[in-house]
Amino acid sequence: MQELNGIKIYDKLPEIVCPEHSCLVVWDVQNGLVNWIFNKDQFLNNLKVFIERIRGKMPIVYTLITPPSRNLTSAWHLFAQMRRFKVDDVNKLPSFMAAGSPEREIPETVKPHRDDLVLEKPSASIFFGTNFEYMMRSRRINTLVFTGIATEMGIESSARDAANRGFYPVVVEDCVSSMDKDAHERSVKTMAKLFIVEKAASLLENIDKK
């Protein structure tokens, strides 16, 4: 660790991912996405092991896609959904991640425990429209460890927003995934230049050095 004008700068991985000031984010790991990623079985196994090793050492926050009511959403959101589902009539948009639907559920093998936080959010950033930042500041969290789906969307946008707010963004390379393997790989390569991208085994080894 270095220090400048009273600011503590963590410059080694064990310091950065110290459990005392870190939080694990499990981003949008819901059946409606998990069932379409390119490496479903490997991803779920990697994530299960990682969560099991982390639990009890640092807080864990699960996010859930929570679409706004059709009557309270934006024109852009509706247009984007039309493109996503390839429909030319807004009235033909299917229900997506509706409350109580199987697609909204978190897979059994990685379900949250009682002490984990489940955060409903309306956008592709963990900070937008939520009280997540307030909770992290209150808990004096400096490092956010990102896992989940999709790499090039919510993971990358949340990591960028985290960095812009002064948090250390850490991405667990083998615990993030996407429906688009090429987009996933491009995003990982981009984030490795901007943030901290490490394999789960490396992170666990350094977390355990505390």
Put a short name on every predicted segment:
Residues 1-23, 49-57, 81, 87-210:
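Active-site-adjacent betaalpha module
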Residues 29, 65-67, 174:
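Active-site loop/turn elements of alpha/beta-hydrolase fold enzymes
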Residues 30-35:
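Short acidic, Gly/Ser-rich segments with clustered Asp/Glu that frequently serve as metal-coordination loops
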Residues 37-53:
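…and closely analogous acidic/polar surface helices at protein-protein or active-site interfaces
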Residues 41-43, 78-79, 163:
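Glycine-rich, phosphate-binding/catalytic loops in enzymes
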Residues 53-73:
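Von Willebrand factor
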Residues 71-85:
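Aromatic- and acidic-residue-enriched segments that line the glycan-binding/catalytic groove
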